[in-house]
């Protein structure tokens, strides 16, 4: 880990590969902030957050399976498999009732974790993610999700680097960081395409059609004035989100930094 003087790197073996993660426990009686980066991002995505919190709270962040240090890793695993591995790692580290902060795909994983272990989580913060439900997606989004791999394979790598970094962050720091994380898949463009278009994860998303009752309260954060379309999107999110009596903060349309 490039920063994180207090963080300790550990690993966990699964049938599909070895997961690497970083953890700092200062008091087992305190809550633990569990940071889950999104697709193609890794633990570096949250380096500023872990640097700030690591001396104040228990902190955990991982490189998700098939990402960064958690490679090589076979791709025949599902989102529910990832949630089970996450739970097993947290048990191993004696982390109970965490607050999970999930960015993009990390938010999907957090929702899967809540579905499987509803009494093993203290709170959920979603950063630029969406409900884990097919009903939330448009027909075009579903069509693209099912055909993503060939589309990414024909996308010129340099153009993809430029579009990916600019589309994920607004600051120079955030864009440079995202570019650096994407470059860890260079020069194997096909590996990046397979990761982005993982069919097992897509199946997990597309088969989930149920709605969930919102029982907590939500906070919306945005860096610019919210238009009615964003407010409507947020309200849909709140109506369908899995919440078990704790509060939820939704950073809607937030840049990934």
Feature map (PLM): residue ranges:
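Conserved HGGG/HGGXW glycine-rich cap/lid loop of the alpha/beta-hydrolase fold
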Residues: 20-72
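Conserved serine/cysteine hydrolase catalytic core
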Residues: 194-245
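Glycine-rich His-Gly loop
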Residues: 35-38, 104, 221
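Gly/Ala-rich beta-loop-alpha elbow adjacent to hydrolase catalytic centers
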Residues: 102-106, 110
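Flexible "cap/lid" loop of the alpha/beta hydrolase fold
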Residues: 111, 115, 122-155
């Amino acid at each position: 880990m490039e920063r994180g003087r207090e963080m300790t790197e550990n690993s966990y073996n699964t049938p599909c590969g070895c997961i690497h993660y970083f953890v700092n426990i200062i008091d087992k009686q305190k809550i633990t902030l569990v940071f889950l980066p999104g697709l193609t991002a890794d633990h570096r995505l949250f380096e500023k957050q872990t640097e700030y919190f690591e001396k104040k709270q228990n902190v955990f962040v991982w490189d998700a399976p098939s990402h960064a240090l958690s490679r090589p890793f076979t791709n025949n695993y599902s989102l529910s498999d990832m949630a089970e591995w996450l739970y097993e790692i947290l048990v191993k580290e004696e982390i109970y009732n965490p607050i999970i902060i999930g960015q993009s795909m990390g938010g999907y994983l957090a929702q899967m974790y809540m579905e499987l272990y509803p009494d093993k989580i203290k709170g959920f913060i979603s950063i630029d993610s969406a409900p884990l439900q097919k009903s939330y997606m448009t027909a075009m989004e579903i069509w693209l999700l099912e055909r993503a791999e060939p589309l990414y394979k024909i996308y010129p790598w340099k153009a993809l680097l430029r579009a990916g970094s600019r589309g994920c962050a607004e600051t120079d720091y955030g864009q440079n960081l995202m570019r650096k994380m994407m470059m860890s898949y260079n020069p194997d463009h096909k590996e990046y395409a397979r990761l982005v278009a993982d069919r097992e994860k897509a199946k997990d998303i597309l088969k989930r059609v149920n709605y969930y009752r919102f029982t907590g309260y939500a906070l919306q954060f945005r860096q610019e004035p919210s238009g009615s379309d964003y407010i409507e999107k947020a309200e849909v999110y709140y109506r369908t989100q899995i919440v078990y009596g704790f509060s939820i903060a939704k950073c809607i349309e937030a840049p990934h930094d």
